């Protein structure tokens, strides 16, 4: 059985983070990360772009989430999983295990 599930994605927070606490007392922070880059594929440059929903769960990860706002640049390390929305549609979500703030140089 193959069990590798790792994703590292950098980008800019493009939707206001939503902070909630589950009924079991676990804090969660949800936001959307927009990624834009130039990648090489088959020897040619191409533009890569995506918007990835991110969820950060647990007490130990919440300290960094308080400084996250729209426009914050981040690198997120974690794993992906499928979440089903109320509308019945499934979407891929990045579950953050490590978040690094990117210094904008200002």
Swiss-Prot record:
Domain (SSB): residue spans on this chain: 4-103
One GO term (biological process): DNA replication, synthesis of primer
GO cellular component, one term: primosome complex
Function: Involved in the restart of stalled replication forks, which reloads the replicative helicase on sites other than the origin of replication; the PriA-PriB pathway is the major replication restart pathway. During primosome assembly it facilitates complex formation between PriA and DnaT on DNA; stabilizes PriA on DNA. Stimulates the DNA unwinding activity of PriA helicase.
HAMAP family with a match to the protein in the record: PriB (MF_00720)
NCBIfam families (UniProt xref): PriB_gamma
The protein's name: Replication restart protein PriB
Organism annotation: Pectobacterium atrosepticum (strain SCRI 1043 / ATCC BAA-672) (Erwinia carotovora subsp. atroseptica)
């Amino acid at each position: 059985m193959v069990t590798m599930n790792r994703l590292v994605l950098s980008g800019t927070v493009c939707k206001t983070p939503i902070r909630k606490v589950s009924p079991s007392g676990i804090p969660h922070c949800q936001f959307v990360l927009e990624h834009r880059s130039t990648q090489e594929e088959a020897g040619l440059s191409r533009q890569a772009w995506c918007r990835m929903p991110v969820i950060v769960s647990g007490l130990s990860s919440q300290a960094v989430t308080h400084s996250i706002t729209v426009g914050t640049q981040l690198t997120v390390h974690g794993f992906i999983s499928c979440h089903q929305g109320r509308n019945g549609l499934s979407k891929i979500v990045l579950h953050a295990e490590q978040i690094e703030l990117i210094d904008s140089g200002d």
